[in-house]
């Protein structure tokens, strides 16, 4: 369902977002 797709997107996005946030901290 839609939630499954959202979950997959989140799991793919988080690993890319975390390092970017860490660089700015």
From Swiss-Prot:
A Gene Ontology annotation in the biological process aspect, one of them, is: defense response to bacterium
Describe tissue expression: Expressed by the skin parotoid and/or rostral glands.
Q: Origin, by domain of life?
A: Eukaryota
PTM Leucine amide: list the residues. Answer: 25
Which of UniProt's keywords are assigned here? Amidation, Amphibian defense peptide, Antibiotic, Antimicrobial, Secreted
Stored InterPro entries: Caerin_1
Subcellular localization is given as: Secreted
A Pfam family that the UniProt record links to this protein: Caerin_1
The role this protein plays is:
Antibacterial peptide, that adopts an alpha helical conformation which can disrupt bacterial membranes. Each caerin displays a different antimicrobial specificity.
Task: Give the domain section of the comments.
Answer: Contains two amphipathic alpha helix regions separated by a region of less-defined helicity and greater flexibility.
Q: Which family does it belong to?
A: Belongs to the frog skin active peptide (FSAP) family. Caerin subfamily.
Per its record, how is this protein called by name? Caerin-1.5
Q: Which organism is it from?
A: Ranoidea caerulea (Green tree frog)
């Amino acid at each position: 369902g839609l939630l499954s797709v959202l979950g997959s997107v989140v799991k793919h996005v988080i690993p890319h977002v975390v390092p970017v946030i860490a660089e700015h901290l």
